[in-house]
Amino acid sequence: MYCQAMSLFRAAEGHRPQWGPWGVALGIMVGNLTLDKRKYADVEPDIKELIEKSQSLMDELKHLTDEDARVFEPLSRAYGLPRGTEEEKAAREAVMEHALLEASLVPLQIVEKAYESLTLLEELGEKGTRIALSDVGVGALFARAALEGASLNIFINTKLMKDRTQAEDLNARTEELIDKGRALSDKVYGAVLKHIK
């Protein structure tokens, strides 16, 4: 089991922290440990579907983590643009506004996908093998870390946006997902804890 988890982590990782993919990788591991067991024959089709969805989601989260770093680069460069004249200030402000939006939209996708991973982990916690149930709980913690970590990237960018309507819309969507994600993470973790303790 440990070797399987490590190979999934290696598949999920890059050169950046990958909390979201790691959480999904743990779900995949639980799913794989459930397959071909007589005790779980009734739910095997569901487990196979959950593994497939989780694999796709893990790939999306890995891509988004890399994309998050990529969209930050223009924002980082924009901070260094000249602002000595009014024209330079206006040009810098326009570049900054666009870069802040781009640097908020990708983390929002991470928040959405992290929440989606919690829904998959919830179902794996209900249907998956009991011998690896603790991994569902850890996966939920990783998913929550991804969700809340990405939300901080959104908030730090929206705070600087001049378009307050857009900033408030992004914040509202993020806060809604944080609330739902915290509740679901607590539910999944709590169910695991109740079963194993």
Predicted regions and their residues:
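Amphipathic, well-ordered alpha-helical segments in soluble domains
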Residues: 1, 22-29, 64-67, 71, ...
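Disorder-to-helix initiation segments
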Residues: 1-15, 39-50, 54-57, 89-96, ...
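Conserved phosphate/anionic-ligand binding catalytic regions in large, soluble enzymes, centered on
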Residues: 1-28, 131-150
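Amphipathic alpha-helix face/heptad-repeat signature
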Residues: 18-22, 50, 57-64, 99, ...
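Acidic, Mg2+-coordinating active-site segments of isoprenoid diphosphate-utilizing enzymes
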Residues: 33, 38-39, 75-82, 149-164
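A structural-propensity feature for long, helix-poor, extended segments
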Residues: 35-80, 177, 184-186
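Amphipathic alpha-helical interface segments
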Residues: 68-141, 157
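Preference for long, well-ordered alpha-helical segments
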Residues: 110, 117-120, 132-191
